[in-house]
């Protein structure tokens, strides 16, 4: 018997100028079972949420001196099996923070420390290179911010979709936002990919389906028309993205900003239903 309970953790929007104290808030208010498949003894649940709200101003004596803000709100998924819980924890640490063989808590701390150190180094280099005072580098363009949030939901076949959204501003015309995904098997905590659910040799056919779906979504009859409206696509079709989720009704393929279109398009989501994929599914 398959049981699906979906929890979506809403994104945290943060005001850059707000005063926050650095904290590691471990919340248990979201505790729930996400999915049970094939056996009622195999469960993944939301253990807690790691929350960080941290700011650092380069020079507190100057009101508009450059500053950095870091907002993190990410759920920790656990299993009844301690070894699986450890595997999940390290997998997320590697996926989100590129910290190998590290716990998620430790990876968060290292991320915050490194970003603040890099920010201070960057501002110091600006001052030293230009021979100016810190007051010459006030304003939005010299402020940094990092926001990391995550959504967790159960989907097709009881698999657990874990989607991370990162918002980054390190100077420039606008911030950048991108998503990364990972899918867990609730039975053993292993990751699940397209290779696990689609038949060998699926890539050419999947590329064709995605290309057709993209053209339909933007009312383009040909690849040339798609190119004319700004999409980055050639005669071989749209590439298969590395980020996707197994929804209840279909696979959602996620193209981050700049992957297949200019910034103004934002992220592009293409959904192929399982009926559309029936010839490719194992």
Residues covered by each model-derived region:
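Sec-dependent signal peptide recognition
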Residues: 2-8
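Compositionally biased intrinsically disordered regions enriched in Thr/Gly
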Residues: 21-282
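Bacterial N-terminal signal peptides
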Residues: 9-15
């Amino acid at each position: 018997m398959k049981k699906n309970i979906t929890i979506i953790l809403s994104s945290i929007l943060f005001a850059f100028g707000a005063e926050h104290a650095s904290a590691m808030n471990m919340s248990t208010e979201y505790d729930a079972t996400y999915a049970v498949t094939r056996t009622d003894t195999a469960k993944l649940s939301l253990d807690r949420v790691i929350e960080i709200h941290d700011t650092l101003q380069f020079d507190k004596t100057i009101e508009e001196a450059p500053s950095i803000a870091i907002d993190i709100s990410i759920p920790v998924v656990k299993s009844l099996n301690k070894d699986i819980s450890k595997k999940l924890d390290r997998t997320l640490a590697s996926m989100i923070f590129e910290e190998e063989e590290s716990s998620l808590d430790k990876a968060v701390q290292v991320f915050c420390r490194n970003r603040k150190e890099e920010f201070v180094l960057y501002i110091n280099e600006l001052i030293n290179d230009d021979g100016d005072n810190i007051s010459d580098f006030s304003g939005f363009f010299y402020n940094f911010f990092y926001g990391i949030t995550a959504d967790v939901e159960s989907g097709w076949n009881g698999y657990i979709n874990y989607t991370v959204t990162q918002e980054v501003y390190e100077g420039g015309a606008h911030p950048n936002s991108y998503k990364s995904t990972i899918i867990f098997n609730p039975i053993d905590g292993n990751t699940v990919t397209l290779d696990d659910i689609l038949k060998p040799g699926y890539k050419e056919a999947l590329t064709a389906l995605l290309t057709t779906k993209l053209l339909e979504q933007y009312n383009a009859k040909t690849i040339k028309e798609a190119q004319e409206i700004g999409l980055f696509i050639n005669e071989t079709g749209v590439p298969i993205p590395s980020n996707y989720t197994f929804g209840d009704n279909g696979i959602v393929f996620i193209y981050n900003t700049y992957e297949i279109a200019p910034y103004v398009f934002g992220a592009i989501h293409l959904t192929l239903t399982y009926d559309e994929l029936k010839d490719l599914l194992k």
